[in-house]
Amino acid sequence: MDSHINANTSFSSPRVSVEILVPTKYAKLFTLKQLTRMLVLSCKHRARQAANPVSKRTSRDRDGSKIMGQGPPAVGPRVSKGHKQQSDGGASLAPVKSKRAVRREKRRCRKKGATKAGTTPVQKGGHCVHASKGQKQATYLSSLLSNPSGAKSRMGAVSKPPQTKNAPDASKGGFTLTAISPAECRKETARRFHPITGTFKGAPGFCTRSREGCGVCAACEAKLAQLGFDRSFDSIGTSRVIRVDSMKEETSDDMASPSATEPVGFWAPAEKQAPRWEGQPIKRCDVVTLARVTPVLRMLRKVDPTFVDNRLLWEAAHSDSFSSAQVRIPLVALATRGREDCCGTSFVYSLTQVGILVAL
């Protein structure tokens, strides 16, 4: 069970947090919106991969949908993306509207009816016979009667609109993104909600044996870890820390260990991880790796292709911002990349695999 639980979170859907460290130069290179989109896509991609594993016989077409057997049929049904597939292959029937489209249309119809003074949209079932009762005024007594004894009585308070436009579905393992600065992150680590007592645990302090503590007991260790965590923000050049909360706790421990989809340098090293309390620490991974792992670089290259390419090539050659990579592309490989002869290509490939720097 993850100990990082926010106060407003229901106990049925515990969160597993991941922090993405964005180096300062990447924060300058990409906007926060682009980084956020990158993270959303990568999280969705990982969730989708975990949810439906593709068998060996299943291939995927260009849109990413599954095809069984011998690939797509010669003539597929021409149905627009937002509608359900037709049983007859979309030949004669008009496309069925999705529930969302129907709701949207109803909403528009209601708005149009409201704008015209004193008119209401025509209902299919004819006029309503029963007049609707006025909303009952919520009093203390009625709230006691309606609510169970344990629940807090809300004195006629209007429910707040959801904070996010597309709120993630807890049952399907949706993802929320929060972009926070290091200071906010420090503040958030102090806000610990205790699920048993229902109280907030304060920031960890040293034990009372001396002014600096004994340095051995659990309280002192927690305090030292917290101090080191605060200092690590200065040593790593991060201007942004983006925290990803997955709404559904993963049953297996595949978040903690790099899988086949995540390369070696995916998670940040241990000294850059958030301090562990009772449960798992907040995992942090590198945004550079994330950009390489996910196909979002195509999207980013649309903005400025040469700049992004130059950045990645410079990185690959000098490996300054992504030093945990096992494979270093030598400068010779970059120099001989233009040659088309097969010997040169195989030579470059072998050099890249071995990772040796050879002077021309």
From Swiss-Prot:
Comp. bias intervals (Basic residues): 97-114
Q: Where is this region: Disordered?
A: 46-128, 151-175
What domain of life? Viruses
Family (UniProt): Belongs to the nepovirus protein P3 family.
Q: What else is known?
A: This protein is encoded from a satellite RNA, called RNA3.
Name this polypeptide is given: Protein P3
Q: Which species is listed as the source? A: Arabis mosaic virus large satellite RNA (Arabis mosaic virus satellite RNA)
> Highest lineage ranks of the organism?
Viruses, unclassified Satellites, RNA satellites, Single stranded RNA satellites, Large single stranded RNA satellites
